[in-house]
Amino acid sequence: MSILTRIFGSRNERVLRKLKKQVVKINKMEPAFEALSDDELKAKTQEFRDRLSGGETLQQILPEAFATVREASKRVLGMRHFDVQLIGGMVLTNRCIAEMRTGEGKTLTATLPCYLIALEGKGVHVVTVNDYLARRDAETNRPLFEFLGMSVGVNIPGLSPEEKRAAYAADITYATNSELGFDYLRDNLAHSKEERFQRTLGYALVDEVDSILIDEARTPLIISGQAENSSELYIAVNKLIPSLIKQEKEDTEEYQGEGDFTLDLKSKQAHLTERGQEKVEDWLITQGLMPEGDSLYSPSRIVLLHHVMAALRAHTLFEKDVDYIVKDGEIVIVDEHTGRTMAGRRWSDGLHQAIEAKEGVDVKSENQTVASISYQNYFRLYERLAGMTGTADTEAFEFQQIYGLETVVIPTNRPMIRDDRTDVMFENEQYKFNAIIEDIKDCVERQQPVLVGTISVEKSEELSKALDKAGIKHNVLNAKFHQQEAEIVAEAGFPSAVTIATNMAGRGTDIILGGNWKAQAAKLENPTQEQIEALKAEWEKNHEIVMKAGGLHIIGTERHESRRIDNQLRGRSGRQGDPGSSRFYLSLEDGLMRIYLNEGKLNLMRKAFTVAGEAMESKMLAKVIASAQAKVEAFHFDGRKNLLEYDDVANDQRHAIYEQRNHLLDNDDISETINAIRHDVFNGVIDQYIPPQSLEEQWDIKGLEERLSQEFGMELPISNWLEEDNNLHEESLCERIVEIAEKEYKEKEALVGEDAMRHFEKGVMLQTLDELWKEHLASMDYLRQGIHLRGYAQKDPKQEYKKESFRMFTEMLDSLKHQVITTLTRVRVRTQEEMEEAERARQEMAARINQNNLPVDENSQTTQNSETEDYSDRRIGRNEPCPCGSGKKYKHCHGSRVARQ
């Protein structure tokens, strides 16, 4: 600690000192607010809104608003906000993260900033990690907010459009992070203003902010449509992978390996060796999937390479019951941070299909991205962002760097007395499991409840089998049993209860020492007062037993890659000043040790074990683990930052497209825009055939006439114009062509009416924009996947990505203009008379077909011989619509046949 810190305190201490002065103000107001009637207290909401309209700021009314919420909470919920919760609420009104320990009442704390900021009328979004927590928190706080005249909405999957709009229209909306992100994307795929759900993104309060903004940061939200089906190719390539042999190290000048592929466990990537490439190519040729003499890395075989690499990763880097589970014939992803299943989510780049083929379930079609955004960029759209969690301080630097959020550690209401014991290391996993079981036995005998944290479904099941063998009764909470989550967590605090939980499954629900009597009462149908009193008495007895036994004991079966996840596990114990203890059991076979410690350190540690099954505790061990975790955290931070830098490029483009799209939706008349881009398009076309500042000999008039005819359906005698007028230069020529195009367009508009044409313009523009944006996203995906190869040419991949994506984006915008004008210029408008005439012609032709039994042309649905004879006698203009009703011009339809005859 520096001398300045000793004198002035840390930044966190200085912030807390300042906020405590506000707490004193709020506490002084309490007697006055207690004296208010319910109606007077309710009237405060309108008073605050009026004061804000009159020019006061949120900070000026904060003390009174917080005093109002505290008093209303006492009357409605029977809960009074502690001083530390008031501090937490003040932190959350700014762009800050409040780190509040488990059990300190984050749900109640959130009511303070939500009420205050909702007074502005812009809407408040309270973001949770799952549907259960969104519903639970909304229902818990709804009576309080409604008492104060605030409406509450819940936005979860499965709502109807009307329910969703009502949820977003509420003053305070509880929602999951994924649903908010997807609704944003859906709004930007809407075809009318009425289809949109979200209003201005004003204030988001993110619960478990570390889980959403850090753990989920690398997960993009994608709305997709089906691409072409290549499931058979995945099934075929799947048969190849088991024959490939792993090579421990990559080939170098000194080392030439014997294997077919190498693995990078840190980044979860697989690479074929030269030998592996030859083996794969031989197999593909044998199977008839690739012609002889071709290479897997040739541009024409890029799809095959994509399938091979996806299958290789599926077999070597993704484990069943660790990364995913198979449920009801489907592959369901398991969240590596929470241990929860993520139904509905699929891995991209063909990985999900490759795993489906590996597990022998139905292989679904690949998807094409229609719209996407990362959580990082979605939450940065909010005017105000704040978050709460029990563990943020370890990631404070990242929150500041990426989101501009300062982390403030809120003191606990009561001192924390949990006993965090030194880690214990064993030589192998079996010795470690033996020690864990002995620790659990000791706790069960003393009637102390135990929560055992594992890092995967597989490990939780291994430990469960070992406990069954030892005759220890226990509950398992992992991705396979998540439906019973609330029930298992409610029982985890009973005396002698043993609960195995994958990572942080059950996070968001407190483990109450002695069990949860309210959860037991909820199981009873219409419980009597006597039954409730009996449950309370039973709980008090159990609570006393558990307190004497030392509170909840936490056992970690191995260290996670992140210190934050370890702290979350420990944080389940010692809530609100309760006793508790924690200990991590480790082995040299743990993933963290194998992947992130070099062989030299591992060998040194192996030599330290001289007796089989002995445990090792030392300060050096703690340093080694801290060093490994710091490396991993830095690696993942760099990965997230790198991803954001790439996504920022796409984000700028996304912002521009969505802004343009919203402008289209909000305006019923875009004729000025159409006129402007018509000029641009014709100028661009003419410049290709008549270059600016060029000599007349360089002009390609014939080419220009053909282009205007083919693309825009305009038959213009430009050669004649030039012969008739020697002074006609490129600018005046362009003006004349645009004038004619506008004149023809106005004639069409006169036929259908102004409103119909405006509606049509808007529809064409939206449809073309959506189609081109979808194609652009696919191109960006391909560019992103291969851009790292530019590094071999001594070029910076990020800079190259920026340049290439900008070029692609400008090309897309040019294509948008061109396609819109082409469509609008070529569109045919039929008058009522033409439609009636075409119908008569069809009926006549049908009668002749019936009489003569002549063959029918599939395209025009009319006979060839009779129609040419029929129409040759009539005087029809070459550019008029063919009366047969085919939709083509007469010269391109039956007129051409007349000419041939």
From Swiss-Prot:
GO terms for cellular component: cell envelope Sec protein transport complex; cytosol; plasma membrane. ATP binds at Q85, G103, E104, G105, K106, T107, D510. Its EC number is 7.4.2.8. GO terms for biological process: intracellular protein transmembrane transport; protein import; protein targeting; protein transport by the Sec complex. The keyword Hydrolase does not apply. SMART domains: SecA_DEAD, SecA_PP_bind. It is found in: Cell inner membrane; Cytoplasm. Keywords: ATP-binding, Cell inner membrane, Cell membrane, Cytoplasm, Membrane, Metal-binding, Nucleotide-binding, Protein transport, Translocase, Translocation, Transport, Zinc. Residues 848-901 are annotated as: Disordered. Pfam families: P-loop_SecA, SEC-C, SecA_DEAD, SecA_PP_bind, SecA_SW. Its cofactor is Zn(2+). May bind 1 zinc ion per subunit. Residues 849-866 have a biased composition (Polar residues). It catalyses: ATP + H2O + cellular proteinSide 1 = ADP + phosphate + cellular proteinSide 2. Coiled coil: none annotated. Residues 888-901 have a biased composition (Basic residues). It is a peripheral membrane protein. It comes from the Bacteria. Zn(2+) binds at C882, C884, C893, H894. One of its GO terms (molecular function) is protein-exporting ATPase activity. Its main location: membrane. Part of the Sec protein translocase complex. Interacts with the SecYEG preprotein conducting channel. Has a central role in coupling the hydrolysis of ATP to the transfer of proteins into and across the cell membrane, serving both as a receptor for the preprotein-SecB complex and as an ATP-driven molecular motor driving the stepwise translocation of polypeptide chains across the membrane. Monomer and homodimer. Part of the essential Sec protein translocation apparatus which comprises SecA, SecYEG and auxiliary proteins SecDF-YajC and YidC. Belongs to the SecA family. HAMAP family: SecA. This is Protein translocase subunit SecA. The gene is secA.
